[in-house]
């Protein structure tokens, strides 16, 4: 667990539908890697978990992702660490 996640850039997906969120996350991850970031924070919210499931589904298949986890202090966020 990284208690200093505020050092990572973040994206807030509130208001996005599933498909738009997936595209936005793909672009955000690509941009972060180009900028040399070690990781990012994705804010998907709690709700019904639709965006969270979509984000995690994408992250599981992205070979650039070393690992990801739900933030212990805010379960509406996923922390992503790059390879």
Q: Which ranges hold each PLM region?
A:
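Long, charged, low-complexity intrinsically disordered regions
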Residues: 1-83
